[in-house]
Amino acid sequence: MELQFLGTGAGQPSKQRNVSSVALKLLDELNEIWLFDVGEATQHQILRTNIRLRKVTKIFISHNHGDHIFGLPGLLSTRSFQGDVGPLTIYGPPGIEQFVKVSLKVSRTKVSYPIKFVELTKPGLICEDKGFRVYTDRLDHRIPSFGFRVVEDSHPGELLIDKLAKYNIPNGPLLGQLKRGDQVTLADGTVLNGKDFLGAEKPGRIVTIIYDTRSTPSIARLAKDADVLVHESTFAGDEAKMAHNYYHSTSVQAAKIAKQENVKKLCLSHISARYMGNKAKKLESQAKKVFPNTILVNDFDQINIPMKGSEK
């Protein structure tokens, strides 16, 4: 599991930062990639990575402001040229389906694969697929905006080989069944329950994506115990009043949430163009005073998310 940031800027593209998009790479887990927001020129950014659009199966849109959706029609069109790509699902606020369909219709663009739209209107579970669940909750922005919480199911514990030694079970299907927690019957009639021979479950990983919003209680619910929290940081910590007036957040507000909700790593994104170059480091340094494991991400940065217990 890995995050790759395709755009980390706010409002408009700059020479240093493109507008919002981040890819959650689940290649080892599902052989899929999920995108969160698709700002203008996201597909150009993808060309500079090893991401293949045929692997993109789900797109989650936080809200319908242009810097988060203007790249969507072009990306969907280009995906048609990737061969047999399979269906794609887009999750987003009311209006995203209309935006996509009108854009494709007016440009007379035909896509070669089915697109399913899931409209976000209320908090809760929106996706459950092959060991992963995605939850959403409303944020506080000028227009309807949603945050996302991706939760991986727990993994079975290790098979306790020493505990099984007395049964002299050879390598083969029976051990595989026991490792899955199944019940098996040995040649002598002994019945073994696989769950009795497994170590403690390994908790799944949690990734939370919070784009445009000002401080609001729903962020805490989405961020709780996250391995990685991606949080918008449009303004510096000493500009909380301005952030509130413009329905955005500061780096310090993001850090406080990370500390309060037992987050492991905080990634600051959605950086205003007013913080160019080294000025952006101000946001990171302010946040680190509150939550040390903070990183200010740049376009194309990659964040590995190891299994719990395997961190180096």
Curated annotation (Swiss-Prot):
It catalyses: Endonucleolytic cleavage of RNA, removing extra 3' nucleotides from tRNA precursor, generating 3' termini of tRNAs. A 3'-hydroxy group is left at the tRNA terminus and a 5'-phosphoryl group is left at the trailer molecule. The keyword Cell membrane does not apply. Gene3D superfamilies: Ribonuclease Z/Hydroxyacylglutathione hydrolase-like (3.60.15.10). Zn(2+) 2 binds at D67, H68, D212, H270. It is an enzyme of class 3 (hydrolase). Its cofactor is Zn(2+). The active site is at D67 (proton acceptor). Its EC number is 3.1.26.11. Zn(2+) 1 binds at H63, H65, H141, D212. GO terms for molecular function: 3'-tRNA processing endoribonuclease activity; zinc ion binding. SUPFAM superfamilies: Metallo-hydrolase/oxidoreductase (SSF56281). Binds 2 Zn(2+) ions. Keywords: Endonuclease, Hydrolase, Metal-binding, Nuclease, tRNA processing, Zinc. The keyword Cell membrane does not apply. Pfam families: Lactamase_B. Homodimer. Belongs to the RNase Z family. Zinc phosphodiesterase, which displays some tRNA 3'-processing endonuclease activity. Probably involved in tRNA maturation, by removing a 3'-trailer from precursor tRNA. This is Ribonuclease Z. It comes from Lactobacillus helveticus (strain DPC 4571). The lineage of its organism: Bacteria, Bacillati, Bacillota, Bacilli, Lactobacillales.
